[in-house]
Amino acid sequence: HVFAKSLLKEGWKITVSVVSSRASIPYQKLNLDKILIGALNTEEKIRSVILNARNKQDGFFCVVDLTHPFATKITPTISKVCKELDQKLIRYERPIDNISKAFLIKKFSDLGSYELKNKSILLALGVRQLQESLIFASGLGAHVYARVLANPESIKKILSSSIIKTNFAILNPLGPSDGEIEKALIRKWNIDGVVCRQSGGRTEKLWQQVCLSMGIDLWLLERPSKLQHVDSIDSYEKLINRLQSISVK
């Protein structure tokens, strides 16, 4: 919501799309044109939103794709529809942080290069990748634990996974974490190492700090390579400059 807040200050009219009512909470106090709630996960849905905006007003000056770097299906879909409709699109790519104290892995099977037998490993991943990572870590003889966020999809997926039911925690953070809950889980389960994603966001930074301070290993699942032929930026300042350069063309 930082981008939306800053763009409003610059005088832009903003429509925001979020996947759930919960995700809309940070935006509700902002003076937005509209908050669209529900996953825009198909070409038809994205096309419909863009065309509706054109029918009811002047349409969107630009679509800004702020989706998660591991949500690999949505960016190509947005890009395809925007190209078809001649809709300007800018993709925000989170900066990649320095990972000097972490091990970078391209895929979960790369964990096989490390001695994990009888080690307690905490999976701090998106729930969609939980079962795959669980299979590899368990297969290497690790004692596997996980933490997931308190939303219906995550709870359903972890309950249907093969993880031992006493080995996961459901977290319901009300704001950015200060790392104390994460440290408490590490102490409770006597964790030797954490697996998380190279997301480039607050969560990755948090795990880097927590693992460093507690002297445990951290494995980062490498971020998917960015999509070619999509106009992308990696900071708010560059976004503003790009929008201004488009508007004077």
Task: Provide a role label for each language-model segment.
Residues V18-S24, Y92-I96, V127-Q129, V148-S154, ...:
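Short, polar loop motifs at secondary-structure junctions
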